[in-house]
Amino acid sequence: MDQQAIYAELNLPTDSGPESSSPSSLPRDVCQGSPWHQFALKLSCAGIILLVLVVTGLSVSVTSLIQKSSIEKCSVDIQQSRNKTTERPGLLNCPIYWQQLREKCLLFSHTVNPWNNSLADCSTKESSLLLIRDKDELIHTQNLIRDKAILFWIGLNFSLSEKNWKWINGSFLNSNDLEIRGDAKENSCISISQTSVYSEYCSTEIRWICQKELTPVRNKVYPDS
């Protein structure tokens, strides 16, 4: 008997095992986030940076103001200290050859001149002919005159237009201040001696008295340490 080959086609399911294909990639928005999320994140970062800059700027400004205030305070303290050392009221002092009388310095001339020339000489010394305010000042001035026979011009003459005795500062004589011996007339000027007050012709050559204010001498007084 002829053996007949029998062929059978086996259609066995092939087991390909696990899928060899690469896993599908994750969605892009899982890693990178949505556009709104990215915008919010950037905005937050920008806000934080801006806040840091503002805080830093404020800190610098405050520090600068504090330093400026400290410097100004130190400057004020130094100036006040200088004022204490140089600007405290000091003694009052007259120039050499001048004599002190109250708050005035007086210079008694040793030469003679007419009244107008005497007035000009005092002006060159940054002073004026003597102005006497009251009887008490007159007496104190006369006490400084050593010789009874010597006369001295003062800053008082007769104003013909106003028919009155007028001081060189523009004020008029109070009749109670000086008891004048002599006439009140044109070209009359006043002189004083150790004992009296006289009206003389302004052209008469006699001595004169200049006056100036006392000069303050600033003493250095150092502040307590």
UniProtKB/Swiss-Prot annotation:
Q: How does it sit in the membrane?
A: Single-pass type II membrane protein
The known PTMs are summarized as:
N-glycosylated. Contains sialic acid residues.
Q: What upregulates or represses it?
A: By IL12/interleukin-12 in NK cells.
Q: Which CDD domains does the annotation name?
A: CLECT_NK_receptors_like
Keywords in alphabetical order: Disulfide bond, Glycoprotein, Lectin, Membrane, Receptor, Signal-anchor, Transmembrane, Transmembrane helix
**Which residues does the record list as glycosylated?**
157
Molecular-function GO term, any one: signaling receptor activity
Topological domains annotated Cytoplasmic = 1-45
* Primary localisation category: membrane
Task: Give a brief account of the tissues where this protein occurs.
Answer: Expressed in a subset of NK cells predominantly in intestinal epithelium and liver. Detected in peripheral blood T-cells and preferentially in adult T-cells with a memory antigenic phenotype.
Extracellular side of membrane: 67-225
Q: List the disulfide bonds.
A: 94-105, 122-210, 189-202
Subunit field text: Homodimer; disulfide-linked. Interacts with acid sphingomyelinase/SMPD1.
Q: What is this protein called?
A: Killer cell lectin-like receptor subfamily B member 1
- The encoding gene is KLRB1
